[in-house]
Amino acid sequence: MPTPSLQFITPHTPELLQATRLIFQEYAGQLGIDLGFQDFDAELVGLPGDYAAPQGALLLALVDGEVAGCCALRALHSADYPNACEMKRLFVRKAFRRFGLGRQLAETILDAARIAGYSHLLLDTLSDMESARALYEDLGFEEVPPYYHNPIAGAHYLKVDLNA
């Protein structure tokens, strides 16, 4: 059996941006919560929006040409941490889980944040996202006080220092 081909791409064509919208919607659907408090619909319409380079990053993971996962990065001007950014929308489709793709996406976004010159990367996650929380801990993230209002019960706020 041949080894699957893995690519990380920045969506730049209308077709790839539409593929990004679809996987973001799939991500939101699996959360089972309303992301309206994050202006999710406006985010979808405006892609790449805040995730555009040079201050942001938007990644799709393709396995044998099929969209398997995504992750994004944006500047975070409202945090109590100087020169901070935020990781958003880390998601791997079920068929592609348990192969380390989530880790690769997260590490690629961490590298993009370092290259962009950020000092801190923050994210929020939910209590029931156990695999993601274990990954974040393994990558050196630590729990911090809330850096924005999230009305969803069980939200956790994490930070990693990029200069460490």
Regions from the PLM with identified roles:
Residues 17, 102, 125:
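Charged, low-complexity surface patches
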Residues 2, 7, 11, 119-164:
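C-terminal "cap" of GNAT-fold acetyltransferases
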Residues 7-88, 93-94, 106-108, 112, ...:
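Acetyl-CoA-dependent GNAT
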